Amino acid sequence: MKDDFAEEEEVQSFGYKRFGIQEGTQCTKCKNNWALKFSIVLLYILCALLTITVAILGYKVVEKMDNVTDGMETSHQTYDNKLTAVESDLKKLGDQAGKKALSTNSELSTFRSDILDLRQQLQEITEKTSKNKDTLEKLQANGDSLVDRQSQLKETLQNNSFLITTVNKTLQAYNGYVTNLQQDTSVLQGNLQSQMYSQSVVIMNLNNLNLTQVQQRNLISNLQQSVDDTSLAIQRIKNDFQNLQQVFLQAKKDTDWLKEKVQSLQTLAANNSALAKANNDTLEDMNSQLSSFTGQMDNITTISQANEQSLKDLQDLHKDTENRTAVKFSQLEERFQVFETDIVNIISNISYTAHHLRTLTSNLNDVRTTCTDTLTRHTDDLTSLNNTLVNIRLDSISLRMQQDMMRSKLDTEVANLSVVMEEMKLVDSKHGQLIKNFTILQGPPGPRGPKGDRGSQGPPGPTGNKGQKGEKGEPGPPGPAGERGTIGPVGPPGERGSKGSKGSQGPKGSRGSPGKPGPQGPSGDPGPPGPPGKDGLPGPQGPPGFQGLQGTVGEPGVPGPRGLPGLPGVPGMPGPKGPPGPPGPSGAMEPLALQNEPTPASEVNGCPPHWKNFTDKCYYFSLEKEIFEDAKLFCEDKSSHLVFINSREEQQWIKKHTVGRESHWIGLTDSEQESEWKWLDGSPVDYKNWKAGQPDNWGSGHGPGEDCAGLIYAGQWNDFQCDEINNFICEKEREAVPSSIL
């Protein structure tokens, strides 16, 4: 280091001599030195600015390009190394320029022009990077919007798939319900058949019971006759027994008398011994007969008691059987009523399920249309997404091309810098040759020179003690890229990359042709039962149920309060002519009062019997049911027509008289032209009271449409098929009530 410093002082102390001219210490060289120093400072500043700008540009490019600009980072690092090498070369040139001649000013000016060109190129590069930054931001925004749309599309597709699965599950559930209902109907039909069979069996049993009752009655009557006969026989036996007792007493008296006679007539004992023995034998026979009679009497009494007990048992059994049959009949009637209600409920449920299935089919058709629309929209969105992805790929390719262009430009610029450096080295060598020809004079001592090069490595010293572990140093700059090695084996699949930047939205593509319908997927598992739905609209009027069995006659009710006195009745017909009376006294004949023949009085309100009056019209509410044409003919036979409802007041009045009853035909139809409803006289409909969603002409495509109108349970209008059976309402003008003639 000291030798280098001494050499620099010697160089600065000597002057130079050329063409016989020798300059002193105070000459133009000082001015040139100051200019050189100023130019060197400017070069340092420019190099520092250049390095700063290049570092900033490289940092921004690396920050914005992410994974796409990995090559840019390596190139930036190589360029930094080259620029540091350029700086070191420039420093060396600056050190050597202090020793060189004045001719370097022109070369410095050329170098300045080159640096200005580099600045312009760097400005262009910055502008391009800013533009690329804007395009990258746009691409990121477009990519984010595409990701959002894709997420929305996925959500909508998931929702649609969930809806389709739920609809399929509901359809499967309804199919299960329908199959269960069919099974229930088949079971009910079997139960009805079994009940009919059991009913026939019960009827047979009842007939058998009636026969057995008749037979029991006959047996009871026969038993009563036999009991009467036995009672008569017992009375006869009692009378015979009494006679026998009297005979026995008489015999005892005779024996006593005989004993007295024997005592008195011992002499006649021998003669009468045979008679006595005979009498004893007869008495013994009589005693045995009496004992047999008493046994027979006991047997007869026991038999009569057993017969009486059996009669009582038979009467109890008869009462029990009557009670049981009555209970069984009541149970059978209750069962029949329950079966009738069940059948009515089943029919209503079947009609409701049919209506519900119709609504389900309509809803499914709506869902199909919405699904097709959404699928077409999704296909359009997917095509647009594909187009945007293609555009993003093209943009990325263009960006890569621009990056390659920038790399090539930077390579050319670095090559130009290396060429400039080589030219500077050549100029320095020329300047050195020129300086050798100068005569060097001792000049004033110059400023302290820069730090010298590192000396040679000395011999290794003795190994010292192991020190503490130092702090981790900063990572060094990456080295230059080495030569490309041989292709290694295929590595394992890498992790999924980070989410790319969002591209710009591309133009909407043309709508593609609809694809072929895919195969029907397997039916899924039935889902959990959903929450109970809201109460639906009242279903259509069901078919009339079967006529129920006649109930038992109830007990008479409490007599109500006495009503108001009625209107005077119609005067009766004149009675038969009586016999002529006795002749009256002669005198002046008085004139008889003229008297009108009695006529049947009409209704007070001007309407026939069973007709009701409202304003100036009469209405007939039928109890029988007919189809539309038969109802119209019935009203025409009554010189009237089916009712025409032309005001709200008339509608409310008719509603009061039909609340709680079944449907009624009115004179409204669209049989002439579909959906053009007219009254039967051809007049248009001014007042309307249709139910919500009516008239719907249900049945088009499935059978005859609904072309006739009627009133339903709520007083609103509904369209029916004309061959259905309903009640009806007739209407005609009220007759004028004539004043009564006294």
From Swiss-Prot:
Q: Which stretches of sequence are listed as region Disordered?
A: 439-608
Chain sites annotated for binding Ca(2+) 1: F644, N646, E650, E731
Q: Which UniProt keywords apply?
A: Calcium, Coiled coil, Collagen, Disulfide bond, Glycoprotein, Lectin, Membrane, Metal-binding, Receptor, Repeat, Signal-anchor, Transmembrane, Transmembrane helix
Q: Which parts of the sequence bind Ca(2+) 2?
A: D670, E674, N697, E706, D707
**Which PROSITE patterns did the record assign?**
C_TYPE_LECTIN_1 (PS00615), C_TYPE_LECTIN_2 (PS50041)
The UniProt induction remark is: Up-regulated in activated microglia and by fibrillar amyloid-beta peptide in activated astrocytes.
Q: Where are the transmembrane segments?
A: 38-58
Q: Where is the composition biased (Low complexity)?
A: 501-514, 534-556
Positions contributing to a carbohydrate binding: K691, Q694, D696, E706, N718, D719
**The Collagen-like domain covers which part of the protein?**
452-511, 527-586
Function as written in the Swiss-Prot or TrEMBL entry: Scavenger receptor that displays several functions associated with host defense. Promotes binding and phagocytosis of Gram-positive, Gram-negative bacteria and yeast. Also binds to sialyl Lewis X or a trisaccharide and asialo-orosomucoid (ASOR). Mediates the recognition, internalization and degradation of oxidatively modified low density lipoprotein (oxLDL) by vascular endothelial cells. Binds to several carbohydrates including Gal-type ligands, D-galactose, L- and D-fucose, GalNAc, T and Tn antigens in a calcium-dependent manner and internalizes specifically GalNAc in nurse-like cells.
Protein name as annotated: Collectin-12
Q: Which organism is it from?
A: Mus musculus
Which gene is the coding source of this polypeptide chain? Colec12
